[in-house]
Design a protein with these regions (language model features):
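Residues within alpha-helical segments
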Residues: 79-83, 120, 141
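Acidic active-site catalytic centers that drive phospho-/nucleotidyl reactions
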Residues: 21, 115, 146
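Alpha/beta catalytic cores of group-transfer enzymes, especially the acyltransferase/condensing modules
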Residues: 131-146
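ATP-binding N-lobe of GHMP and related small-molecule kinases
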Residues: 2-107, 125, 129-134
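Short, small-residue alpha-helix embedded
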Residues: 113-127
Length: 146
């Protein structure tokens, strides 16, 4: 299942659709060391998405959004995803991220998780694919269980 598909512009900007999803089944397992639970799920994307635009930046992570009440710091999963990406890559880096929210917040549709996944995929493309899909999945697991 593709959660995001990015379009790269001039090697410095990635534009992604971050699709909502619904769980068709959800089995909750044991608690992980990070406090989240292991889950097994069958999910399906739906035709509702947030637009995520990621621009390469040398040093800072800056998030802007069309919703004033969304966090723009490390409490935002997209911000945390960016931090994890550069930590794993072992280089200083940053990004300017704009999130146009269409997915309802806290509705169980994985809007925030999808935004984090979109940022990881976008950065991976912008930095010439340093991580495999499996490695990106491991980075994403550090951010949550969705």
């Amino acid at each position: 299942m593709i959660l995001s598909k990015e379009t790269i512009i001039n090697g410095k900007r990635a534009i992604c659709r971050s699709y909502a999803k619904i769980n068709l089944t959800l089995d909750v397992g044991g608690k992980r060391s990070d406090g989240y639970h292991e889950i097994k799920t069958v999910m399906q994307t739906v035709n509702l998405f947030d637009l995520v635009i990621v621009d390469k930046c040398d040093s800072e992570i800056k998030i802007t959004t069309n919703k004033k009440f969304l966090p723009t710091n490390s409490k935002n999963i997209a911000y945390a995803a960016c931090e994890e990406f550069f930590k794993a890559l072992g280089i200083p880096g940053g990004a300017r991220i704009f999130i146009h929210k269409n997915i309802p917040i806290a509705a169980g549709l994985a809007g925030g998780s999808g935004n984090g996944a979109a940022v990881l995929c976008a950065l991976n493309s912008l930095y010439s694919q340093p991580f495999s899909d499996n490695e990106l999945e491991k980075l994403a697991l550090k951010l949550g269980a969705d």
